């Protein structure tokens, strides 16, 4: 399909990517991802519709049918606010990339952090699920250059300024999320040492990540790709 979607282990910017003999599969992946994005998130219109059931509507309006329009207007305000937040965080690009990866590899991770939405391919994270398919643990691997790391993190590494080319070697930082009780807990590590100040927690139903699967198979931690169906 598209070799750059899932590079071989050890690949870098100088690796020569194998070019398939035919572009049919690559075009198919691009077209399918585009059609899925248009269907799921159509431009200039809400991709979901908020509504209330009859009993809740009775409570909100007190049985007055003339107030239904007010309820609908408030719900539309919420819809527009969600759409505005989505556009502000520039989510369409990572969502399109997620769809491409799901088609080819069956797995992709979306993470909503302080800098917006980031996506991670299958070789950048691991996930553990229970037999019911619920996520128990996620670990994300990110690589940074030495000059971009803050001083407190740099002190935890084995970086030596006298090492030849050491300033160009990437440093791996791991972000771990694990479920414990009614909360998700998180912290970061570098070279097996916890980075101070990175600890945090989230409600169990509001984690800042989404480990997506194309086809979920019972008892398996990862999903199956669309291309495996052919």
Give residue spans per PLM region.
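Extended, helix-rich architectural segments
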Residues: 1-169, 178-179
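N-terminal export/ancillary region detector
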Residues: 172-173
């Amino acid at each position: 399909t598209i070799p750059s979607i899932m590079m071989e282990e050890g690949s870098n910017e100088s690796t020569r990517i194998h070019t398939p003999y035919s572009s049919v599969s690559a075009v198919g992946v691009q077209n399918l991802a585009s059609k899925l994005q248009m269907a799921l998130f159509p431009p200039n219109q809400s991709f979901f519709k908020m509504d209330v059931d009859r009993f809740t509507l009775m409570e909100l309006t007190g049985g007055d049918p003339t107030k239904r329009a007010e309820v609908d207007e408030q719900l539309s305000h919420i819809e527009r606010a969600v759409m505005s937040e989505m556009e502000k965080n520039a989510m369409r690009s990572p969502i399109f990339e997620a769809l491409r990866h799901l088609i080819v590899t069956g797995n992709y991770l979306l993470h909503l952090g302080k800098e917006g939405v980031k996506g991670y391919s299958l070789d950048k994270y691991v996930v553990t699920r229970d037999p019911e398919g619920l996520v128990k643990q996620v670990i994300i691997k990110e690589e940074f250059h030495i000059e971009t790391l803050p001083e407190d993190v740099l002190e935890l590494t084995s970086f030596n300024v006298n090492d030849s080319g050491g300033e160009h070697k990437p440093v791996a930082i791991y972000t771990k999320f694990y479920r414990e009780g009614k909360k998700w807990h998180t912290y970061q590590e570098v070279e097996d040492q916890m980075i101070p100040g990175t600890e945090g927690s989230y409600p169990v139903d509001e984690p800042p990540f989404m480990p997506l699967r194309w086809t979920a198979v019972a008892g398996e931690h990862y999903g199956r790709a669309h291309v495996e169906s052919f």
